[in-house]
Amino acid sequence: NGAKISRFNRVTDIITLPTGGYEVITEQGNIIAEHVVNAAGCFAPEVGRMVGAHVPIINLEHQYLITEDHPDIAALVKEMPVTRDSTASAYICQEGNGLLVGPYETRGSKPWAIKGMDWNFDRELFAGDLVRLMPWLERCMELVPLFEEVGVKTIINGPITHTPDDNFLVGPVAGLTNFWNMTGASIGIAQGGIGKYMAQWMVHGQTELNMASLDSRRFGPWADKKYCITRAIESYERMYASASPTENRPHGRPIRTSSLHTVMAQKDAVHFVSAGFEKPAWFKTESIREESETWTHNEAHAVVAEECAAVQNTCGITDISGTAKFRVTGPDAYAFLDRLSCNKLPTKDGRISLTLFHAENGGIMAEQTVSRINQEHFVLMGAIGCQIKDMQWLQQHVGDYQVTIEDFSEDWGGVLLTGPKAREILQTMCEDDLSNNAFAWLSCQTIQLDSAPVFAMRVSYAGELGWELHMPVWQLISIYESLMQFGQPLGLQDFGTRAFNSMRMEKMYRAYGAEFTEEISALEAGMDRFLDLSRHFIGSENLLQRQTVGLSMQLAYLVFDDQIPAECFGNEAVFANGDHSGIITGGAYGYRVEKSLAFAYLKPEHCKAGQALTVETSVGTRHCHVEVDSAYNPNNSLLRS
């Protein structure tokens, strides 16, 4: 039906209608809208506040200059290419017969309008401040000597929006229906693509592209103004910095912590952050206190090896509080989750299953570990980075189902106790029977630890005998300290996410955001044994169609044949017989098997066992082959022990 553009017409308020939709109040009259898109740029936080939405955006000043003409540039036959240089933290390109030079200062950047925007502001520019830019302009002159031969014609200084991670804010706004963000752009050349996928999202409810890194729901209320300012400045000043996999940016932290955070810090944990949540990555030793930023194995490599060895030989414990947790209750709880789940739900109380939720287009929307308490009570656990998105996915599919959904992620914490001595340690402080007959693998029950009820799940992402122990946050320190008291004489040791990731790779366990994304279905991800296509669930028709037509790519498990001290981290190109076959999703060194491991999506014909491959990595070409079984304990005897 076309569209109407109304210019010079300020929106003064937005009213959420009880019948659905919105009434947009403007200076020239009111508009009833089914959908509202917040594409207000610098004003986006103000517009968000009209409907009670938090928009984590900060404006920063950015300057660029245009030079006078230079005869050498005028004489060019082809236009000079756009150049970006990390040492100058700047972009340089041709502008007419002169240059356009835009540095991102790596210190001293200036936030703007942090107390709120003036509604009378309209494309005004600020006074230029070349003195602030001189260190980077001088480096640009070294890179392009003719730059110092010309005068400055124009200085442009204006506000640009920045988010805490410098990615767009796109997609549904949590807690609202049909209210969307399309803002937070600090780069000016991507709006066409963003518009395309935004349209798909609004019309179809999902996109063909994985939008996780842009999804505005990756930030929750925890991303307050102080955090946004600090992180946005850091992101701006590191715009052209080359980040290593071990880079650990300190600003704006900690913002989300486990109740064990201080305890872990006192034990020399090195915390990394995921969705704002602090997670111990590895623990310093007397001899190894720091790690270098590098793409190869660094000082922490030996420490992580010791942590993995403890898990394999005795027992390890790690904080798993940074997990999204949902409680689904009500008469229709089973039927509701059955409609979302691609796997059969547990039919017996106290059983656990792993499942995936799909969109209608077949993309994986969520990975959940589902624990059945009873027919009307289920507990779901998933990735902390998907907490808000997963909650909204659950809520938007409630329909006529009689269910209640509770997010208790912030209220409960937990630890994983795993290793061959896990049962012995746990049994010393627990009167419940923890034998295989009484507490089988992939089952759950409430047990008593220190006379306190703890929700115990017999699962271990590390691939050893183990229990996840979940409890209210106020219990966590006491339970952890008791476990350490009883466990240390038996060799119990802390371990972090670095070791955890290594062990999940050895077990061939996929991860959401890497092997599972909205561009992938359970079929491509090789999750056939967790997929029941005999029943109808959201996305099942698309999966049946994919199964009939055939897959264009499949997930392969790669074991490296060389001993190069470096790993894959994602997005490396994979080749078979010299032809490009696919891309790495992630990798790690397997300390228990002493091999480098990775996952990759490849052409199906290259996913057979033994297929030789090469991978282009940061340290050069590496050789590997495909395996179809996990590198560590493929028959799961240790998990079942």
Where are these regions (language model features)?
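Flavin-dependent oxidoreductases
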Residues: T12-A127, P135-L143, Y227-N248, G252, ...
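C-terminal catalytic lobe of FAD-dependent flavoproteins
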Residues: T87, G96, K110, N120-I255
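Short loop segments at secondary-structure junctions
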Residues: D69-D72, E95-N97, T106, V173-A174, ...
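Short Gly/Pro-enriched turn/cap motifs at secondary-structure boundaries
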Residues: V55-N59, M80-R84, A90-Y91, G151, ...
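Glycine/proline-enriched, intrinsically flexible loops and inter-domain linkers
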Residues: L209-N210, D215-S641
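Short, low-complexity Ser/Thr-rich regulatory SLiMs
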Residues: I15-P18, Q94, P172-A174, V370-N374, ...
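A conserved beta-strand/loop element that lines the FAD pocket in flavoprotein oxidoreductases
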Residues: G2-V11
